[in-house]
């Protein structure tokens, strides 16, 4: 795939009128291909491998919150970056997920061509699937380069999406506890 991407990036540069043999551009197609592979390596991962058995028995049913997980992704409409923070809460039912796995789940889905709305849902569904939690909440904040660099060019715009599952959706008190804990 890397050779194909390199060739396509070279063609794109040529179509734009650039000289691909110019000093600063000689290795650009190769670097761009490598960057694109890294930015989309989520396609090569699956939930079971990412979790890697890191589900642990725990005598707790109280809310667990992981906040300010940084992420970056590429929007599926313009292939431009969007970046932000993800906040996750879940209500364990005798099992907890290893802490680093939350960030790994976020990265796995973020490193695919995405929209933030879909990314938020994928993360919530994945956490629900692997933990069997009584409730899951995911809130994502993002700044989208497709809004900032092109089109309407609104530099201070941001987007917030949320998905609430189970008790997080059904109980106002539980949802409000999550929002309070993350300062929203």
From Swiss-Prot:
Gene Ontology biological-process annotations: one-carbon metabolic process; tetrahydrobiopterin biosynthetic process; tetrahydrofolate biosynthetic process
Domain of life: Bacteria
Chain residues that bind Zn(2+): 75, 78, 146
GO molecular function, one term: GTP binding
Coiled-coil regions, chain positions: none
Enzyme Commission numbers on file: 3.5.4.16
Record-annotated disulphide pairs: none
EC primary class: hydrolase
Keywords linked to the UniProt accession: GTP-binding, Hydrolase, Metal-binding, Nucleotide-binding, One-carbon metabolism, Zinc
Pathway: Cofactor biosynthesis; 7,8-dihydroneopterin triphosphate biosynthesis; 7,8-dihydroneopterin triphosphate from GTP: step 1/1
Reactions catalysed according to its record: GTP + H2O = 7,8-dihydroneopterin 3'-triphosphate + formate + H(+)
Annotated Gene Ontology cellular component terms: cytoplasm
Similarity comment: Belongs to the GTP cyclohydrolase I family.
NCBIfam families named in the record: folE, PRK09347.1-2, PRK09347.1-3
Assembly: Toroid-shaped homodecamer, composed of two pentamers of five dimers.
PANTHER family assigned to the protein according to its UniProt record, in alphabetical order: GTP CYCLOHYDROLASE 1 (PTHR11109:SF7), GTP CYCLOHYDROLASE I (PTHR11109)
Protein name, per record: GTP cyclohydrolase 1
């Amino acid at each position: 795939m890397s050779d194909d991407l390199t060739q396509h990036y070279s063609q794109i540069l040529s179509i734009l009128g650039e000289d691909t043999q110019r000093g600063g551009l000689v290795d650009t197609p190769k670097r761009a291909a490598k960057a694109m592979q890294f930015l989309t390596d989520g396609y090569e991962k699956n939930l079971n491998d990412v979790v890697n058995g890191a589900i642990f028995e725990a005598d707790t049913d109280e809310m667990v919150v992981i906040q300010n997980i940084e992420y970056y992704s590429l929007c599926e409409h313009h292939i431009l970056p969007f970046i932000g923070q993800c906040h996750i809460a879940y209500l364990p039912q005798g099992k907890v997920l290893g802490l680093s796995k939350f960030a790994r789940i976020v990265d796995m889905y973020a490193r695919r061509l995405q929209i933030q709305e879909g990314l938020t849902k994928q993360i919530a569904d994945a956490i629900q699937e692997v933990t069997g939690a009584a409730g899951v909440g995911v809130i994502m904040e993002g700044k989208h380069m497709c809004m900032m660099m092109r089109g309407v060019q609104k530099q201070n715009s941001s987007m917030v999406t949320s998905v609430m599952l189970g008790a997080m959706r059904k109980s106002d008190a539980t949802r409000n506890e999550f929002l309070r804990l993350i300062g929203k």
